[in-house]
Amino acid sequence: TMWGTKWCGSGNKAINYTDLGYFSNLDSCCRTHDHCDNIAAGETKYGLTNEGKYTMMNCKCEATFQQCLRDVHGPLEGKAAFTIRKLYFGLYGNGCFNVQCPS
């Protein structure tokens, strides 16, 4: 995980759901994202197979995560959120999926 957080990065170091790191606003964004609907690499769900190397997230969760990161401010925490946003959405770019009910 990233310094100052318990939820940002691969896995988490939190002892429970309410356990947040020093950058609590940023950590809250990551915690919510970690609990989003997803399809793990190599898994199939909703008739979709994730053939990528990384977990594929629900598109609504990705949009919410991106906005949450944008809403984090402060000289250190804001820069950390900006860095995560640029790395995650700029380099990671695994795509996302939408679930729609049949009409």
Curated annotation (Swiss-Prot):
Disulfide bonds join 8-30, 29-68, 36-61, 59-96. Its cofactor is Ca(2+). Its main location: secreted. PANTHER family: RH14732P. Keywords: Calcium, Calcium channel impairing toxin, Disulfide bond, Glycoprotein, Hydrolase, Ion channel impairing toxin, Lipid degradation, Lipid metabolism, Metal-binding, Neurotoxin, Ryanodine-sensitive calcium-release channel impairing toxin, Secreted, Toxin, Zymogen. It comes from the Eukaryota. The active site is at 33. The keyword Metal-binding applies. Expressed by the venom gland. InterPro entries: PLipase_A2_dom, PLipase_A2_dom_sf, PLipase_A2_His_AS. Ca(2+) binds at residues 7, 9, 11, 34. Its EC number is 3.1.1.4. This is Phospholipase A2 large subunit. Binds 1 Ca(2+) ion. It catalyses: a 1,2-diacyl-sn-glycero-3-phosphocholine + H2O = a 1-acyl-sn-glycero-3-phosphocholine + a fatty acid + H(+). It is found in: Secreted. Glycans are attached at residue 16. GO terms for biological process: arachidonate secretion; lipid catabolic process; phospholipid metabolic process. Phospholipase toxin, which catalyzes the calcium-dependent hydrolysis of the 2-acyl groups in 3-sn-phosphoglycerides. Inhibits both skeletal (RYR1) and cardiac (RYR2) ryanodine receptors (calcium release channels). Probably blocks ryanodine receptors by generating a lipid product. It comes from Chersonesometrus fulvipes. Belongs to the phospholipase A2 family. Group III subfamily.
